[in-house]
Design a protein with these regions (language model features):
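Basic, alpha-helical terminal appendages of large translation-related enzymes
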Residues: 1-32, 259-262, 271-275, 355-372, ...
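Conserved oxyanion/phosphate-binding beta-strand-loop segments in alpha/beta enzyme cores
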Residues: 1-36, 66-75, 99-106, 279-323, ...
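Residue patterns forming the tRNA-binding/recognition surfaces of aminoacyl-tRNA synthetases
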Residues: 2, 11, 18-19, 91-248, ...
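Long, charged, mostly alpha-helical binding arms that flank functional sites
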Residues: 3, 224-229, 237, 362-365, ...
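NTP-handling and nucleic-acid-processing catalytic cores
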Residues: 3-13, 49, 135-362, 468, ...
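N-terminal catalytic cores of NTP/NDP-binding nucleotidyl/phosphoryl-transfer enzymes
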Residues: 24-94, 100, 123-138, 244-245, ...
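Helix-rich, typically C-terminal accessory recognition domains appended to large enzymatic cores
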Residues: 79, 144-145, 149-156, 410-441, ...
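Flexible, glycine/threonine-enriched loop-and-boundary segments that flank and lead into catalytic domains
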Residues: 214-241, 288-317, 321, 419, ...
Length: 835
């Protein structure tokens, strides 16, 4: 019978819809397993092939766990607030709510089309007022605990989205969402004090099973360092303070630099003789993003503050002060000391402005470049009492001296900044606060939540940078919940990251009207046992959700300090590059491609995009080859954690494998158990597939199944052999497996159970190695046949078995065996001569 994948997949998807085999049961006595993937943003384009990679992997893990006797929670939802939907709605003149529901409907269809074992009764949607009621409730708890505050500050402003971006949302000077340039603006913003949790966010990484690159990225982003704050005297009434991790280099300080935003500059306006020049520089710096002022800032610019003198506390010498935009007000004290002999950025600045360069750690040639050691073994020179010490010895010695002299003290510093939490857009959760002229900011009473996002006539962007909600005067104007006076609602909305910072908790108890999650459900399901997601979310969603979870732990909502016990990540799937030089034959054509597309022309695979025409739509793949083929290929494509390239030919190869499994059903004998001949390959494959799924080596698990099928075609197979194959293949290709399971009578054998409801096969270690082996027999180098002998038989046993062979006996008749060449378990060669 033909493998009609379309009919088979519809049949089983309809059945799963009816019987709900993926429903998780809170409080069940089975051990629990909570497997989580990052819920998708429901874009208008629908699923792309990047989605099925993590979704399929976690589905396989959860299916195996279910078969191993676990009560599995494998949920799905939609992270539906945010800029893309709003921008699409503005462009197409459709309300974002309508767009969102259309997109969710399409995503749901596609997810079910791929056969994912989600618990569809637990779906969450961040735009549902019954969901964001609790997002607002959590924000109010943050506000009540002084972890949410409003302040005027320089912020990242996307010139296209016309809204504020968090530092984490700016990538290489542009908006990570739309790619438009990001500039700096002064705006009043709601902030969350994530910095209060900086130490715990770093220290608690030791208690979780995250892949190392995730831990490293989070540690680097938080950027904790222990150093020294040093006070420098000036010729004004103000001292300045500098933070440094290399207090040992103080003798090498030849200048200082202040941030353009530092408040001291305004205070010194009457002292600075070239104020007009400084003010113009400040204005230019204000138009740049932090990235432009940092990583992109190759040319060192600045203005010397004429009239300001700074005294180096180590040497007593006067050094100049500059204002330069490479110093950011948000890190350290907003003032840095310049040690050009041992910092390349400082060296470049000193060269640009003709400043002295002093060597204080010997070993390099500071006339050519700064000398920067990667370790602390360098020897101090030109450093007074530190001379002759190693850097390792000099740092504590200088720190002790600075403390004793009263101009220094130890300080722990962080790169992490508080989270910019408000957005001047429409499509987000309303911030449930009211601004009263008498009472200040007052929370909306909890019993009035959710504060529902109102319908607006125009949700398009305002040129003045205010939220579209600001035009809704009937909604904005309200009464103060505290004193009853006239007041105004906050019109900014929450960022997209708000709803995703706690969604994993709502999955545990999605229909609870009284609290975000009950203690019963959270105690049972928490923490998430395995969370897989993209590396691009490591310093955004993953960090934010850990922060919110720790806060919820502090106020008694959850019982675990960390939300996720395990975190893994997956590689991106690339598309074929239509502009690759390998696609053309002549050098002239290759040169033309390089001239037009640069380095991109040298890469055979690139990120999929509509403009390149290399986007792969899962709908098309499923229509042509079936959902099981799509699932199988997306796992067979390569190392799960690394980038992989889509190949239509390789998809066809996975379809051929499933065809072979389908056709293999006709060759199954009535022998019920695992056959003796296939026992080694069956038990070895069970061991391999079990271990590989647990370690995300899905491609090698599939390769092992393919090898086993090859053996079955060579050896023949029993019902027991086929049963083992179907059970192992079930997580990868569930539709086809259930059809074969039913057709071959296994469902009847197990009282109507589907394959997915049966126990995962177990292996016997002793049977993973064959008890006998087939060996080739040669007589004087000529092949005479094969023999079956026990594994690791000695030479005498092998020779006797060979001599018992009819062909060998005939070949050595009348001959004398003068030598035996024995390759254990492989070959025996009898060297003979006439008697």
């Amino acid at each position: 019978m033909k493998y009609d994948f379309a009919a088979i997949e519809k049949k089983w998807q309809d059945k799963w819809e009816q019987v709900k085999p993926y429903a998780a049961v809170t409080g069940d006595k089975r051990p629990k397993f909570y497997g989580l993937i990052e819920f998708p943003y429901p874009s208008a384009a629908g699923l792309h092939v990047g989605h099925p990679r993590p979704f399929t992997a976690m589905d396989i893990i959860c299916r195996k766990k279910r078969m191993q006797g676990y009560n599995v929670l494998n949920p799905i939802g939609f992270d539906a607030f945010g800029l893309p939907t709003e921008n699409f709605a503005i462009k197409n003149h459709i309300h974002p709510a309508i767009v969102t529901q259309q997109n969710i409907k399409n995503f749901t269809r596609q997810l079910k089309m791929l056969g994912y074992g989600f618990d569809w009764d637990r779906v969450v949607d961040t735009t549902d007022p019954q969901y964001y009621k609790w997002t607002q409730w959590i924000f109010l708890q943050l506000f009540k605990h002084d972890l949410a505050y409003k302040t005027t500050m320089p912020v990242n402003w996307c010139t296209s989205c016309k809204c504020v971006l968090a530092n984490e949302e700016v990538v290489e000077g542009v908006c990570e969402r739309c790619g438009a340039p990001v500039i700096r603006k002064e705006k009043s913003q709601w902030m969350l004090r994530i910095t209060k949790y900086a130490d715990r966010l770093i220290d608690d990484l030791d208690d979780v099973d995250y892949i190392e690159r995730v831990k490293t990225q989070q540690r680097n982003w938080i950027g904790r360092s222990t150093g020294t704050e040093v006070t420098f005297k000036t010729n004004t009434e103000d001292d300045i303070t500098v933070y440094t991790t290399r207090v040992d280099t103080l003798f090498g300080v030849t200048y200082t630099v202040i941030s353009p935003e530092h408040p001291l500059l305004k205070k010194w306006k009457g002292i600075i003789k070239n104020w007009d020049e400084v003010e113009a520089y400040q204005a230019a710096a204000a138009r740049k993003s932090d990235f432009e002022r940092g990583e992109l800032n190759k040319d060192k610019t600045g203005v010397r503050l004429d009239g300001i003198e700074v005294i180096n506390p180590a040497t007593g010498k006067v050094v100049p002060m500059f204002v330069s935009d490479y110093v950011l007000m948000g890190y350290g004290t907003g003032i840095v000391m310049g040690v050009p002999g041992h910092d390349q950025r400082d060296w470049d600045f000193a060269k640009a402005f003709g400043l002295p360069i002093v060597e204080v750690v010997e070993g390099g040639d500071i006339t050519k470049e700064a000398f920067t050691l990667k370790d602390d073994t360098g020897i101090m020179v030109n450093s007074g009492f530190l001379n002759g010490m190693t850097v390792k010895e000099a740092i504590p010695a200088m720190k002790k001296y600075a403390v004793e002299q009263g101009w220094g003290h130890e300080k722990v510093n962080y790169k992490l900044r508080d989270w910019v939490f408000s957005r001047q857009r429409y499509w987000g959760e309303p911030i449930p606060l009211v601004n009263c002229p008498k009472c200040g900011w007052v929370p909306v009473p909890e019993e009035e939540l959710p504060l529902v996002l109102p319908q607006v006539d125009s949700y398009e962007l305002t040129d003045d940078g205010k939220s579209p909600l600001s035009k809704m005067t009937d909604w904005v104007n309200t009464k103060c919940p505290k004193c009853g006076c006239d007041a105004k609602r906050e019109t900014d909305t929450m960022p997209q990251w708000a709803g995703s910072s706690w969604y994993f908790l709502r999955y545990m108890d999605p229909h609870n009207d009284h609290e975000p999650v009950s203690h019963e459900a959270e105690n049972y399901w928490g923490p998430v046992d395995w969370y897989n997601g993209g590396m691009e979310h490591t310093t955004l969603h993953l960090l934010y959700s850990r922060f919110w979870h720790k806060f919820l732990y502090d106020i008694g909502v959850v019982h675990t300090k960390e939300p996720y016990a395990k975190r893994t990540s997956h590689g991106m799937i690339l598309g074929q590059n239509p502009h690759y030089v390998g696609n053309v034959s002549t050098q002239e054509e290759k040169d033309a491609l390089i001239a037009k597309y640069g380095n991109q022309a040298l890469r055979p695979a690139v990120k999929m995009s509509k403009s390149l025409g290399n986007v792969v739509n899962p709908d098309d793949v499923v229509k042509a080859y079936g959902a099981d083929t799509m699932r199988l290929y997306i796992m067979f494509i390569g190392d799960f954690e690394k980038v992989a390239t889509w190949s239509d030919d390789a998809v066809k190869g996975c379809k051929r494998f499933l065809d072979r499994v389908w056709n293999l059903a006709d060759q199954v004998t009535e022998e019920d158990g695992v056959s003796e001949k296939n026992a080694p390959i069956v038990h070895k494959t069970i061991k391999k597939v079990t271990d590989d799924i647990d370690t995300l080596k899905m491609n090698t698990a599939i390769a092992a199944l393919m090898a086993m099928v090859n053996e079955f075609y060579s050896n023949g197979l029993s019902r027991g052999d086929f049963e083992a194959l179907l059970l192992m293949l079930s997580p990868f290709a569930p539709h086809m497996v259930e059809e074969l399971w039913e057709q071959k009578g296994f469902a009847a054998k197990y009282e109507g159970k589907m394959a997915m409801q049966c126990a995962w096969p177990e292996y016997d270690e002793s049977k993973t190695v064959a008890s006998s082996v087939e060996m080739a027999v040669q007589v004087s180098g000529k092949f005479k046949g094969t023999i079956i002998v026990p594994v690791d038989s000695d030479q005498d046993t092998v020779v006797e078995a060979a001599k018992a062979s009819e062909k060998v006996a005939k070949a050595i008749a009348g001959m004398q065996i003068v030598k035996v060449i024995h390759v254990k378990n492989k070959l025996v060669n009898l060297i003979v001569k006439p008697c």
